[in-house]
Amino acid sequence: MTVSSGDPDVHASRSAQLFERADLVIPGGVNSPVRAFHSVGGTPRFIKEASGYTLTDVDGNDYVDLICSWGPMILGHAHPAVVEAVQKAAATGLSFGAPTEGEIELAEEIVGRVAPVEKVRLVNSGTEATMSAVRLARGFTGRTKVLKFSGCYHGHVDALLADAGSGLATFGLPTSPGVTGAQAEDTIVVPYNDLDAVAQAFAANEGRIACVITEAAAGNMGAVAPQPGFNEGLRKLTSDNGALLIMDEVMTGFRVSSAGWFGLDGVAGDLYTFGKVMSGGLPAAAFGGRADVMAHLAPAGPVYQAGTLSGNPVAVAAGLASLRAADQGVYDALERNSATLRTLLSDALTAESVPHRVQTAGTMLSVFFSEDPVTNYAEAKAAQTWRFPAFFHGLLSRGVYPPPSAFEAWFVSAAMDDRAFSIIADALPHAAKAAAAAVQP
């Protein structure tokens, strides 16, 4: 494997050695593509441990974590309440293949927070949640077509990979080989934040669209919030046309508020998908919604879905502990920390006259190297993304770990304190200078 010469000391590092070793037995050396640093160059850091806001790699380097495991760690890493819950659950058994009381408690916690969700099914990943929600929408409506938005990522479900964000955006791929033409034909893709395009799609496919699936606020083309009235417009268009509205809150759920994005705009979906925060950092996710729709799910109804490890007791314990520890003080801290980071980023880039927009979607944020606001995927791709690798490494080399992609949201945790922001503030001038000096290829 070739290691980027722009990554200093990499040939001598333990991370580099592990990356070489991993590449022999793991495709690309990683188990999720964005971790490979392909879009920013250099060698991925292999992490040994984490605590609070700090990641420590196998070479002993510490980083302020602005990835938070891609969203779940709102409390910070190794939070005592979550660790204790996991240890206690693991001591009584790792998996039973039978129901537990904890599953009911986690479902009750979700239903109690998000009013439109009346029943919930636990699964193992956000991909499983969106796949199952779409299948249920098709089964409930008797229709086949799904409408999604360019740049919105809903996991690696075949039907939902068309023009998706996240890793596909990072690698510049419109879709994935292996997705059949028949699957693609049932997926309608329109620009995000464009209600006219949605209305036209319904008119052109009258009586055939089962559901519209949208990120409640986009985080996989960077942080792009819905424009005022957009989610409300989706609610009306789906209702008027007999389709279901699936709100994908895998990223926003229980991060942007205790009730997710629903807690911010109050727009009710028919189905919801959750993951990340509700997992406490372990493999767990969920989908849920209206009771009459969920009644079509097996064993109550004919739409099949199952999972050997769904509702795993250790993952359930982590999720419950994380949600219960996330009191209003945690959400207030997330708001403050997101606002502070946004100001630091903008001030540093402004000082170097770098064109930029630091955009937020709730407490998620991202940096676009653009003079203009970004409201959709086309505008995100039109930004000067070639500046991002230099900016990224300027931060990483000084102890700050942002997402290794221009198209991923940045995340803060409630564990961040003055010292964390001091490290970020010290690193940003160098990173901003590097972004300013970057040359378009």
From Swiss-Prot:
Cofactor(s) for this UniProt protein: pyridoxal 5'-phosphate
Stretch forming the signal peptide: none
Catalytic activity field: (S)-4-amino-5-oxopentanoate = 5-aminolevulinate
EC number, as in UniProt: 5.4.3.8
N6-(pyridoxal phosphate)lysine modifications at: K276
Pathway annotation: Porphyrin-containing compound metabolism; protoporphyrin-IX biosynthesis; 5-aminolevulinate from L-glutamyl-tRNA(Glu): step 2/2
UniProt-listed PROSITE patterns: AA_TRANSFER_CLASS_3
Cellular compartments annotated: Cytoplasm
SUPFAM superfamilies: PLP-dependent transferases (SSF53383)
NCBIfam families: hemL, PRK00062.1
Cited PANTHER family: GLUTAMATE-1-SEMIALDEHYDE 2,1-AMINOMUTASE (PTHR43713), GLUTAMATE-1-SEMIALDEHYDE 2,1-AMINOMUTASE 1, CHLOROPLASTIC-RELATED (PTHR43713:SF3)
Annotated protein name in UniProt: Glutamate-1-semialdehyde 2,1-aminomutase
Annotated organism of origin: Rhodococcus jostii (strain RHA1)
